[in-house]
Amino acid sequence: RKYCCSCTGFRCKLIFFINREKTGNSNLINDQEKFNRVFGVDYNLRSKNSKWSGSLFYHNSIDEIKKDDSYSTGINLLYNSRNHGVYSKIISIGEGFESDLGFIRRKGIFKQYIRYERRFWIETEKISNISITPSFRYITKPNKNSLIMDRDFSTSFEINFKSLSNLSIDFSYPYTYLDSEFNVTRKDGAIPIPIGGYNYPNLEISFRNNFFKEFTYFFEVGSGQFFNGTKNSIQAKLAYRIEPIFQTSLNISYDKIKLPKPYDTAGLWLVGPKINFTFNKKLFWSNYIQYSNIGESLGINSRLQWRFAPLSDFYLVYNDNYIASNIFVPKVRSLNFKLSYWF
C-alpha cells in the first residue's frame, strides 16, 4: 500500500496504490481472487473564506479477469454561509469495480444528490434559528437503460433552540424499484413483495434535547406508506453519562407494518442497551446488547481495550448471538483478540 500526498494552501491531492496478492499455492482460490489492485487520485479543495469546499476522485481496480467498467469516480461541492447552504454530489461506480480492502455497497450505478438549506435567524427568547431544507436524490442503472432504482424528494423543517434542543419535521416521497422479491417481515412462509416500482410518502417528527447535558434523549415518530402497505414507527434513545468514567444508553425502535392480503403484517422491535466504562487513560470496557424479534435474535458484544503505548492497543472481544426463545443454544460464540503496535 503506497500513498503520495501533496497539499498546497487550500488544495490537497492524494495519489495511492493498493495491492492485494495471493502468496503460496491453493486450489481453493479462483483466478479472480489471485490479486486485486486499486489505484487512484483524490483531490480536495477549499476557498480561503471556507465558504466553498469540494472534492473529486477517480479510482480504478485491476483483477486477473479484465473488465471494462472497473472504475469508481465522483465529485462533490459544498457552499455554506450564515443564511444559505448548498450541497451537491455525483458518483458513478462501474459494475466491474472491485476493492478487496474496502466495502462497496452498490455497483453499476449512477447517483446524484442535491440539497439546499435556507436558514432564518429569529430574534426570540428561546429560538435561535429556523431552517428549511429541500433535497433530491436518485440512483440509476446505466447498463439497464438508466433504470431508476431509487428516487427521493424530501423537505426538512427544523427549529433550533438556544438551549441547543432541536425539533425537526421531515416529509419525504421516496421511490424504490425492487429488482428481486422482498420478504419484509422475514417470517417463514410469508409471501414476499413482488418485483416492481413503489412510491411510499412518509412523515417524521423528531425532538432531541441538549446533547451536552449529562442526561440526553431523542424521540421520533413516523407514519406513511411502505411499498404496497403502511408503516407507523416510533423510536427513542436515552443516554446518561458520568464524566469521565461511565456512559450508558438505550435505543428502542418499533415499526408496525401493515400490508394488504395475502401479504403478512408484523410489529418489529429493536432494543439495544449500551454500557461503557473508562477505568483510566489506558483501560476501557464497552458492552453492547441487541435484541430483535426478527428471527428472535439476541446479540452480546463485550470489548476490553488496553492502550499500552501511543496509538497501540490490545483488544479482547467476546461475541455471543442467541435465539431469544432458547438462550441455552448459542448461534455464534467467539472470543477474539487483536494487537496493534505503532512503531
Spans of model-derived segments:
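Exposed, low-structure sequence patches enriched in small/polar residues
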Residues: 34-36, 48-343
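Aromatic-lined, polymer-binding surfaces characteristic
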Residues: 1-45
